[in-house]
Amino acid sequence: METTLNNGTKSHEVITPTDLINHWQGHRALTRRVIEAFPEEAFFNHTIGGMRPFSDMVMELLGIAGPGIKEIATGKQAPLNEHFEHGNKKAKILELWDEATNEINTYWVQIKPEQFQQHIKIFGQYEGTVYSSIFYFIDNEIHHRGQAYVYLRSLGIEPPAFYER
């Protein structure tokens, strides 16, 4: 794919949409393994230094990823929802995580390459481009996973290797 820049020069694509989704899904698979590594009670209650429990961070990630990609693909805005019924069961969170992964995959293929440069207001609140929104989704997940690594280590649990995506 070639893009013509404003000054008339051509730019070649650095990463394809397929490469980007594969990269993100590698991160999501790693985050799933981090969720699995937590003892049930600690997943919902363990905190350090005023940070939220990892379960709350995962609720945020669930509220952003699947619904965000769906909004980008369909153009239909929905309010940001970071609260999901889980009954304090890690198995339910993992089920929701897998559903979100499927939702991302379903809607990702509907995003046309030219859409990545479009300006949007995701969830009716956050302005940027499609690609900057997706980068935020990924960066936010990495950020919260890093917090979870600190939690796991404080519990005496070796987290999954960060590079095994």
Locations of the language-model features?
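Short, contiguous alpha-helical
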Residues: 2-7, 21-25, 29-35, 40-83, ...
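Short, low-complexity N-terminal intrinsically disordered segments enriched in polar/charged residues
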Residues: 10-18
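Active-site-proximal helix-loop elements at catalytic-domain edges
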Residues: 17-22, 105, 109-111
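Soluble or luminal CAZymes and related metallo-dependent hydrolases
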Residues: 16, 23-27, 96-99
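Acidic catalytic patch
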Residues: 109-124
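Helix-adjacent hinge/juxtasegments
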Residues: 70-107
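Alpha-helix capping at helix-to-loop junctions
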Residues: 106-113, 143, 157
